[in-house]
């Protein structure tokens, strides 16, 4: 019986096999297409992966949009004038579009940078990228940025201890093929899932003890401090309102308070007694004039008005006020008064 040879089939490289690297996007401009930099970038990338080609103005003008999470890498080669125009207008919106088109952990390569783009790393960070390598000071340097593994705002479920594990498993298949029997044996191994555990809650009794009013272990938990027991008789006594003595040179208060004890009430009464008085009389200037009189004259006029006969009026309405007076009334402009009394207006009145 002839011996049987057993061969293990191995995958041999073939030119028809797709590359291990994911699809890439090459972005250029008219200037880089004319000087050959864009074509060189495409030739270099097509050797190892599938490459989609796009010009910058298509993205900036909104003529096309990128499919979400399609490209493993995006390579941008622009001229210095293109970078300057982007920095002044639509750089933030372009970076947002590129972030959308990249897969998680995909990389963005900005090539042929100039030394004037100092704010580009900060713009990448604000757009959601992680800057892996920054450009140097030499013209032609590049910046490499990466899209985070999780998008901003992505939710991750947290399961408590003892809950069911996830149902999704990863299968590893090992295949062995023999040429004599043409049989295939497959072994499937499921990768164990690791649940995410929440933080264990603390002891409620320990937390409650932190807010206890007493640290004495023998004391009752219901023991409370009586706030009234901490006050003395002096604390409970109603304070007597007092004010500082009045100072004639300092600015005074508007008015003395009730039951004033600082002397302001007496000062106001004294000023009222000694204040000058203006007497308005129709006998002055023939039209009802005004003159200032002292205290003695004021008292004399008051006494004279009290003893004088009642005043008379040709129309009988002079004493009722301006609404009842004629145009030539000598009392025009004066307040209403009783017949025979003098009208007095103090210097402190606002309507004089």
Curated annotation (Swiss-Prot):
The keyword Amino-acid biosynthesis does not apply. Residues 315-329 are annotated as: Fe-S binding site B. Its main location: cytoplasm. GO terms for biological process: iron-sulfur cluster assembly. It holds the Pfam family CIAPIN1. Keywords: 2Fe-2S, 4Fe-4S, Cytoplasm, Iron, Iron-sulfur, Metal-binding, Mitochondrion. Its cofactor is [2Fe-2S] cluster; [4Fe-4S] cluster. Component of the cytosolic iron-sulfur (Fe-S) protein assembly (CIA) machinery required for the maturation of extramitochondrial Fe-S proteins. Part of an electron transfer chain functioning in an early step of cytosolic Fe-S biogenesis, facilitating the de novo assembly of a [4Fe-4S] cluster on the scaffold complex CFD1-NBP35. Electrons are transferred to DRE2 from NADPH via the FAD- and FMN-containing protein TAH18. HAMAP family: Anamorsin. This is Fe-S cluster assembly protein DRE2.
């Amino acid at each position: 019986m002839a011996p049987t040879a057993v061969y293990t089939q191995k995958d041999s490289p073939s030119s028809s096999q797709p590359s291990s690297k994911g699809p890439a996007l090459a972005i250029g401009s008219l200037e880089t297409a004319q000087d050959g930099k864009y074509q060189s970038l495409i030739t270099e990338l097509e050797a190892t992966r599938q490459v989609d080609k796009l010009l910058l103005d298509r993205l900036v003008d909104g003529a096309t949009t990128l499919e979400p999470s399609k490209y493993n890498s995006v390579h941008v080669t622009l001229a210095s004038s293109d970078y300057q125009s982007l920095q002044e207008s639509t750089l933030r919106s372009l970076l947002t579009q590129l972030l959308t088109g990249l897969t998680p952990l995909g990389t963005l390569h900005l090539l042929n940078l100039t030394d004037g783009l100092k704010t580009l790393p900060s713009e990448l960070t604000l757009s959601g990228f992680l800057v892996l390598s920054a450009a140097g000071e030499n013209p032609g340097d590049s910046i490499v940025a990466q899209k985070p593994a999780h998008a901003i705002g992505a939710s991750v479920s947290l399961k408590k201890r003892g809950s069911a594990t996830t149902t999704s498993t990863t299968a590893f298949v090992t295949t062995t093929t023999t040429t004599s029997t043409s049989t295939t044996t497959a072994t499937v191994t499921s990768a164990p899932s690791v649940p995410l555990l929440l933080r264990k809650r603390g002891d409620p009794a320990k937390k409650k003890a932190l807010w206890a009013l007493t640290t004495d272990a023998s004391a009752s938990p219901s023991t409370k401090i009586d706030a009234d027991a901490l006050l003395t008789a002096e604390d409970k006594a109603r304070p007597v309102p007092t004010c500082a003595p009045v100072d004639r040179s300092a600015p005074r208060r508007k008015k003395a308070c009730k039951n004033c004890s600082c002397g302001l009430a007496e000062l106001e009464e004294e000023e009222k007694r000694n204040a000058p008085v203006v007497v308005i009389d129709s006998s002055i200037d023939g039209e009802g004039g005004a003159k200032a009189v002292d205290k003695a004259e004021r008292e004399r006029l008051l006494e004279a008005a009290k003893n004088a006969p009642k005043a008379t009026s040709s129309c009988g309405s002079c004493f009722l006020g301006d609404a009842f007076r004629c145009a030539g009334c000598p009392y025009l402009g004066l307040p209403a008064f009783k017949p025979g009394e003098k009208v007095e207006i103090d210097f402190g009145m606002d309507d004089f």
